[in-house]
Amino acid sequence: MTLDEAIKSLMALQAKLAAYGHAMGLLFYDGATTAPKGTAANRGQTMSILSEEHYKLTTGEETVALLEFLDAHKSELDEKQQRMVFLLIKDIRNMQKIPMDEYVAYQQLLVEADDVWHRAKETSVFALFEPVLEKIFETNIRFAHYCAPEKDPYDYWLSEYEDGLTMAQCDEFFATLREHIVPLLKKIKAQPQLDDAMLHGHFPEEKQAQLSDYLMRTMGLDLDHVGLSTTEHPFTTSLGSHFDERITTHYLEENFASSMFSVIHEGGHALYDTGSADDLAYTVLDGGVSMGIHESQSRFYENLLGRSRAFTGFVFPKLCELFPELSGHTAEEFYRAINKAEPSLIRTEADEVTYSLHVMVRYELEKRVIHGELKVHDLPGEWNRLYKEYLGVDVPDDKHGVLQDSHWSGGSIGYFPSYALGSAYGAQLLRKMRETVDVDECLKTGNFAPINAWNREHVWQYGCLKKPGALLEQALGEKFDPTVYTQYLEEKYGEIYNL
C-alpha cells in the first residue's frame, strides 16, 4: 500500500463512519421528536444492527492495519491527517476494549432509556426510570474500567466530554465559582426583587414559532442546513456532517422566554457545528472539539449576547409585534425581567447567577453514584436535599427534580460540568472579542456578522483539529481564568440590582 492509497482509504473510512453516525443520529433524533410512542423497540432493533456494523468497521483488521500504517508514516502526513489518525486510533483502542455484545446492548439500552425517561417524566414517577438508569450507570462504570483501568471511572468520563478534565480540576473550578456566586446571591436576595410578570401570560405557540424563525435568521443560521423541531428537552445534533444540523425547542404557551432562550442556546451550538471548515466534513475533525467549548458557544449566544441590554433593545420591538400585550412595557423592563436572579427548580430556566449551582448538584450526585457512595434508588431524595441546601428551594415532584434532564437517559454521565465551564469560557472569549469587535453596536442593530466572523476565525473553523485547551488558549491569547466569568456576573448583576 502506498501512502497516497492509504490516505484515500483513510478518507473513505471516515465517510463510512460518518454515514453510520448519520443513520444512528437520525434514529435518536426521530425518537426525541416525531416518532410515535410505541416505536422504541423497533428503533432499538435497528440501532443494534447499525451499532454492530459500526463496531465491526471501527475495530476490523483492515481498519487497524490502515491506521497502524499511517501512524508509522505520520511524519509524512499533514496536520489534519495526523490529527485524524490520532483520534481514530484513540477511538479504536477504546472500542477494542469493550466486548462487541456489550457495546451493541448498550446502544439498544439507550434507545429504551429515552422512551422510558419520557414516560417517567410525563408521570413524574422516578421508579419507572430507576431500573434503566441503574443499568446505564453500571455500564458506564464497567466501560470506564475496560478503557482506562488505571483511572478513576468518573475522571475517565469527565475527560471524554472535556479532554483532560478531572474531578480535582472540577472541584477547584466550582470552589472558585462558589466563592463569588454565594455572596453575590446573598446580596441580591437582600434587594427588592425584579418584576418578571411580563414574561407570563398566554403566548400562542404559532407566534413563538415565528419568533424562533426570526431569531435563527438574526443569529446568522443558514436555514437551508439547520432545521428546528419540538421535543421534551431541547438539544442539537449534527447528522452525518455539519451540512445537516438539527436543533429543537419546547414551547410553553405561558412563558415565551423559555423557548426564546432555548432557541438562542441551541442556535449557538448549531453555529459552532456549521462553522467547521468545509474540508473537515465527513471526517472525525468535523464539529465541536469538546462539550465545554460547545457550551461556551451556546451559552455565549444565549446569555452573554441574548440577555444583554444591547440585544434586548434590538429584539423588543419584534416581541411587541408578535405579542401585542408586551407593548405596555419597555425594552429596559424586558431586560430586567429576563435577568431576574432567583433560585429555581429547573436548570434550563435558571438565571446566570444561580445556574452553576444547578450544575454542581448534578456533578456531586454523579460522582457519588459512580463511586458507589449513593444508590440510584436514592437519587430523588438526595437531589431534593441538595436543591434545598444549594438553592434553598423545595422540589415538589420528580418531574421538576431528578427527571428534568435527558442527559442520563442518553448515557451522558460526566457531561454536566461542561455547562459551567462553557459559561466561564464564553465570558473570557467575549472579553477578548471586544478588543476588535464593537459587540454592543452589533447587537443594537441585530448585526451578528462581525461576531460570527470572529468566532469562526478563532473557534469554529478548527473543528476538532486542536485540543480544547490549546484552541481556547490560542483564541484568548492567555490562560483560562474563571474569575473573568465571576467578575462579569458581579458587574452585570451589581448594576441591575444596585449592589
Sequence positions of predicted segments:
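A well-structured
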Residues: 1-163, 490-499
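C-terminal, non-catalytic "cap/extension" segments appended to globular domains
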Residues: 2-3, 22-25, 32, 38, ...
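Divalent metal-coordination and catalytic microenvironments
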Residues: 10, 148, 265, 298, ...
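Active-site recognition of the HExxH zinc-binding catalytic motif
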Residues: 10, 258-277, 295-299
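Secondary-structure capping and boundary motifs in well-ordered enzyme cores
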Residues: 42, 102-105, 132-135, 173, ...
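Contiguous, non-catalytic segments that form substrate-binding/exosite surfaces or channel walls
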Residues: 106-258
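All-alpha helical catalytic cores of prenyl diphosphate-utilizing isoprenoid enzymes
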Residues: 174, 178, 205-209, 215, ...
